[in-house]
A protein has these predicted regions:
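NAD(P)+-binding Rossmann beta1-loop-alpha1 motif at the extreme N-terminus of oxidoreductases
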Residues: 1-49
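Internal alpha-helical scaffold of NAD(P)-dependent oxidoreductase catalytic cores
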Residues: 139-251
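NAD(P)-dependent Rossmann-like dehydrogenase/reductase catalytic/cofactor-binding core
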Residues: 224-359
């Protein structure tokens, strides 16, 4: 199986390093010509869980990557999911796997754009419940793989295909486990409920460009309590949608070797989190991604299912006041009522579900 990586940020470079170590070098594409040129000319210096100076092969176009690869890892920010899907339209090959690695409703967006073509060509669209590798980029041709989680959820837009996708990925990614649906993977993503309060209560630090540690300095016991309140609402919304999700604390304890009694303890006892730097700008994914793609959908689904979300509403209102942006209006352009089509055992064959969603 040939892997293609879409996006050469820290997570894309981490995936490239991981696959190289596994004896499965990937083809990499990024929308930035400079990033592509740097990687092609100088390769990638990996440190941490993978060590070494690694060669990187790049594709000049998204179409070239699609033509040469069997498994496409979409490692972009959430705002890049739809443009990537539009760029891939008409270029899928039979039997390909398209895997979105940061949830945020990415698989649903891909299905909205590519679903009919994917069904006709036997392609599988999937997403994970978060990033498997915690990584950062010290420099343009560098990546530091801090740690690798022991387990993450994965689901396909067609739940019946999840097992086959897991088997295809298992040689390189044995950490993935089956989720019931892409609603479970997107609603299991706990980054938004974690990052939102941290960003709000450290907004002055971000605005001033200060140097601080995200969890060691930015997550106090009171901030952790706010995270827990948002997480209670996330779980309530998910259960109203018929989706079995676990709490943020349960998921953290699943991902790391030593269980902890509270969210505060889970973050502060993990050395990987203690060295993570906090954002030094308000133009950061904690705001531009986690609010519209993570928290706003919870509010919209809460309204749809009659689940009150006072903590989420308050947090988004404060960000609207500070940033002058309505993040609810920036939520993914999905038919939220139609998401039940992605749940198992809905009666319609996959082609019928996708046609209904496209109408």
């Amino acid at each position: 199986m040939k892997y293609g990586i879409i996006g050469a940020g820290s997570t894309g470079k981490a995936a490239a390093a991981w696959l190289h170590q596994a004896g499965c070098p990937a083809l990499v594409w990024d929308r930035s010509p400079r990033k592509r040129a740097d990687l092609a000319q100088s390769g990638l210096l990996a440190t941490g869980k993978v060590e070494g100076q690694l060669p990187v092969e790049t594709a000049d176009t998204l179409e070239e990557l699609a033509a040469r690869c069997d498994i496409l890892l979409i490692q972009t920010l959430a705002e890049g999911h739809r443009p990537v899907a539009e760029g891939l339209a008409g270029h899928l090959r039979p039997g390909q796997i398209l895997l979105v690695t940061n949830c945020c409703w990415g698989a649903a967006e891909l299905a909205q754009v590519l679903g009919q073509e994917a069904a006709e060509k036997g392609c599988r669209i999937a997403e994970t419940s978060g990033q498997l590798i915690l990584a950062n980029s010290p420099g343009p041709g560098q990546v530091y793989l801090k740690t690798v989680k022991k387990q993450l959820l994965l689901a396909c837009t067609d739940p019946a295909a999840t097992g086959a996708v897991l088997e295809a990925l298992r040689p390189e990614w044995p950490q993935y486990a089956a989720a019931s649906s892409i609603l479970e993977t997107s609603l299991s993503g706990t980054n938004p409920v974690t990052h939102g309060p941290i960003a709000l209560f450290n907004l002055a630090r971000m605005d001033n460009g200060e140097d601080y540690r995200l969890f060691a300095d930015g997550l106090s016991p009171l901030t952790a309590r706010c995270v827990e309140q948002l997480d209670i609402e996330r779980v309530a919304v998910a259960r109203a949608c018929g989706v079995p999700v676990r709490t943020a604390l349960e998921l953290l304890n699943d991902a790391w070797p030593t269980p902890q009694p509270t969210l505060y303890d889970a973050f502060h006892s993990n050395p990987s989190y203690m060295v993570t730097k906090g954002p030094a700008t308000t133009h950061h994914r904690f705001i531009t991604e986690d609010l519209p793609y993570g928290l706003a959908p919870l509010v919209l689904l809460g309204r749809l299912h009659g689940v009150p979300t006072p903590a989420l509403d308050a947090l988004l209102d404060m960000f609207r006041l500070a940033m002058g942006t309505d993040y609810i209006a920036l939520a993914p352009a999905l038919d939220w009522k139609g998401l039940s089509a992605f749940l198992p055992y809905q009666g319609l064959p996959l082609e019928g579900k996708l046609a209904a969603l496209a109408d």
